[in-house]
Amino acid sequence: DQVTKFFVMDNASSFATGIQILPIFDLVYVQNDGVSFGMFGGMPWWGLSALALLICAVLGVLLFRSDNRIEAVALGAIIGGALGNVVDRFRFQAVTDFLSFHIAGLYWPAFNLADVFVVCGVGVLLLYPVWDARRQA
């Protein structure tokens, strides 16, 4: 996550106008002072960082108590992604986003790899119990 953000920031002038990779996918440079989808934009960076660290601490306790590898990997992905964005907040008071998907003029808010880890981890935590129940039925 941090390596990709470093690359984007190092080439910010190129990414500022967007680089089309596919007709529906661009690489862009956005500094997001909120959380996912820009929610809570304008909230102090340190407040968002403190909240993220508190959530990571709670998830860390759950991680160490977990006896399920899939759950542990999902929790680790969430914690890792959240900490990647906390690093940005401490360094730049905002998070670097650079992945932009769009279709027919509709744009999904830009995001980064840390966000991908968080979303995938949450997805696994939500879907694994359903899959496991079906598997054991």
PLM features: residue spans?
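Alpha-helical transmembrane bundles and membrane-interface segments of multipass inner-membrane proteins
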Residues: 2-137
